[in-house]
Amino acid sequence: MPKLKTSKAIAKRFKVSSSGKILRHKASKSHLLQKKSSKHRRHLSSTCQVDSRDAKNISINLPYL
C-alpha cells in the first residue's frame, strides 16, 4: 500500500494545535481594510477553530500532521 500524501493546499491553510484541534485564519483580512475599524481588523487577526463538520474532511487530507 503506498504512502498517504498530504494535501499541500490544505496544509498551508490550516494548523493542528497541540491538543489536536484544527485551527484556521479568519477571512476578509487581505484587502479593502480601510473601511474596517481597527477593532474589526484586530478581531480578524486571531485564529479560530474549524467546525467539527469540516474537521473530519481536513484531517483526512492531513494524515501526518
Curated annotation (Swiss-Prot):
The terms under GO molecular function for this entry are: structural constituent of ribosome
Keywords for this entry? Answer: Chloroplast, Plastid, Ribonucleoprotein, Ribosomal protein
Q: Does the keyword Transferase apply?
A: no
Which biological process terms from the Gene Ontology are attached to this UniProt entry? translation
**Alphabetical list of SUPFAM superfamilies matching this protein:** L35p-like
Basic residues composition-biased segments: 22-44
State any GO CC term: chloroplast
- InterPro entries per the record? Ribosomal_bL35 (IPR001706), Ribosomal_bL35-like (IPR021137), Ribosomal_bL35_CS (IPR018265), Ribosomal_bL35_sf (IPR037229)
| Cell location | Plastid, Chloroplast
Region annotation (Disordered) maps to 18-50
The UniProt similarity line reads: Belongs to the bacterial ribosomal protein bL35 family.
The cross-references to NCBIfam families, in alphabetical order and at most eight, read:
rpmI_bact
Q: What is this protein called?
A: Large ribosomal subunit protein bL35c
Where does this protein come from, organism-wise? Porphyra purpurea (Red seaweed)
